[in-house]
Curated annotation (Swiss-Prot):
Belongs to the gamma-glutamyl phosphate reductase family. One of its GO terms (molecular function) is NADP binding. Catalyzes the NADPH-dependent reduction of L-glutamate 5-phosphate into L-glutamate 5-semialdehyde and phosphate. The product spontaneously undergoes cyclization to form 1-pyrroline-5-carboxylate. Its EC number is 1.2.1.41. This is Gamma-glutamyl phosphate reductase. It is found in: Cytoplasm. Its main location: cytoplasm. Pfam families: Aldedh (PF00171). HAMAP family: ProA. One of its GO terms (cellular component) is cytoplasm. The gene is proA. It catalyses: L-glutamate 5-semialdehyde + phosphate + NADP(+) = L-glutamyl 5-phosphate + NADPH + H(+). It comes from Mannheimia succiniciproducens (strain KCTC 0769BP / MBEL55E).
Length: 419
């Protein structure tokens, strides 16, 4: 039986110990974690294979299985991400600002750890390492609750982390996992406000809503990516095709994949046949409005009429919505209606229209002439991310180290009293 109150107490105690560590001590523990991830590859992959087999037996989609899958290459990449976190500046103890008041009181606003982070996620074993490494770097303890699909993978990964912490002389309970698949434990975790300071869900809309609606702990909402690319009439069409191919097909199971392509009406008949030919080898399936449907059917593309609900879909597959718009105003209006405030891009040669798009589109990341696939902590130079926040309070976009800190005012006087 999982005792969450005991886990919370242990995490709170570990968080205090972590908050007192030097940057060197934390980095040493992270280095040991990276080493053990590589040294224990065979064991980790064997446990992950159990999860993959169960996923296939249970009929899970290929997009979910891709998220669940660990390979030697992916494990090496995860270990490298941990080492990259080591190389990042530690925000804890950083003086944000300050000054001296007329009373002589000296003020400094200093970054401090949040305390204990609760992370709830689905079929993403890499999140176990990503979140743990960022939390440890910032002096936070973490309680991890992965989906039942990752049960074996998470258990071995947390074991690797705890062994590294023990070797480094740090509290093992700084990183804990709820491995019991009982969903009632999620609700219990969401009410563990005596011990947990922040909840970060990573998963679909259902998980986000569950946490937002039921938690007594502050929740960071995000990760749902209904991302758009608008191809404006002045865009370099050949270079635009390369960006769209990257944004849709590089790894479609990620939240920064483009799901809807907006094409300006004046170039649609010229551009869409090129798009169909470009993406044919990738087996992309189009869902198009009436105008785009007619054009794509004319070149024998794999296309169906798009529905209202599909315009709100986070496909996470090789499906792509295509909508024709008259111009930038209609493109922005469409994004405002259907976007999830994650990542939005314009392809254009007009600096004026690029500036207008950036000013009018409300999203965590807005791109000009670039793929939406860059919305990622590693790509942004933040190290592995704990989440991509699509809300506006506390953190927005890829959440790196600073997003896992708060601050306190340090006030130093000379036996100073208020007048």
């Amino acid at each position: 039986m999982t005792d969450l109150i005991q886990m919370g107490k242990q995490a709170k105690q570990a968080a205090f110990a972590l908050s007192q560590l030097s940057q060197q001590e934390k980095n040493h523990a992270l280095a040991l974690i990276a080493e053990r991830l590589e040294a224990q590859q065979e064991r980790i992959l064997a446990e992950n294979a159990k999860d993959i087999q169960a996923a296939r037996e249970n009929g899970l989609s290929e997009s979910i299985i891709d998220r669940l899958l660990l390979t030697k290459e992916r494990l090496t990449g995860i270990a490298d991400d941990v080492r990259h976190v080591i190389s990042l500046a530690d925000p804890v103890g950083k003086i944000i600002d300050g000054g001296v008041l007329d009373s002589g009181l000296k003020l400094e606003r200093i970054r401090t750890p949040l305390g204990v982070i609760g992370t709830i996620y689905e079929a993403r074993p890499n999140v176990t390492i990503d979140v743990a490494s960022l939390c440890l770097k910032t002096g936070n303890a973490v309680i991890l609750r992965g989906g039942k699909e990752t049960q074996h993978s998470n258990k071995i990964l947390v074991e690797v982390i705890q062994n590294a912490l023990q070797q480094a002389g740090l509290p093992e309970m700084a990183v804990q996992a709820i491995t019991d698949p009982d969903r009632a434990l999620v609700m219990e975790l969401l009410h563990l406000d005596k011990y947990v300071d922040m909840i970060i869900p990573r998963g679909g809309a259902g998980l986000q809503a569950l946490c937002r609606d039921n938690s007594s702990i502050p929740v960071i909402v995000g990760g749902i990516g209904v991302c758009h690319i608008f191809v404006e009439q002045s865009a370099d069409q050949d270079r635009s095709l390369a960006v769209i191919e990257n944004a849709k097909t590089q790894r479609p199971s990620t939240c920064n994949t483009v799901e809807t392509l907006l094409v300006q009406e004046s170039i649609a008949e010229e551009f869409l046949p090129k798009l169909a030919r470009r993406l044919k080898t990738k087996e992309v399936k189009f869902h198009a409005d009436s105008t785009a449907l007619s054009i794509l059917q004319g070149v024998s593309a794999d296309v169906k009429p798009v529905t209202e609900q599909q315009l709100r879909n986070e496909w996470l597959t090789y499906d792509l919505n295509v909508v024709i718009v008259k111009g930038i105003e209609e493109a922005v209006e469409h994004i405002r209606e259907y976007g999830s405030e994650h990542s939005e891009s314009i392809l254009t040669e007009s600096q004026k229209l690029a500036n207008q798009f950036v000013a009018q589109v409300d999203a965590a990341a807005v791109y000009v002439n670039a793929s939406t696939r860059f919305t990622d902590g590693g790509q942004f130079g933040l190290g592995a991310e704990v989440a991509v926040s699509t809300q506006k309070l506390h953190a927005r976009g890829p959440m790196g180290l600073e997003a896992l800190t708060t601050y306190k005012w340090v006030c130093v006087g000379d036996y100073t009293s208020r007048a």
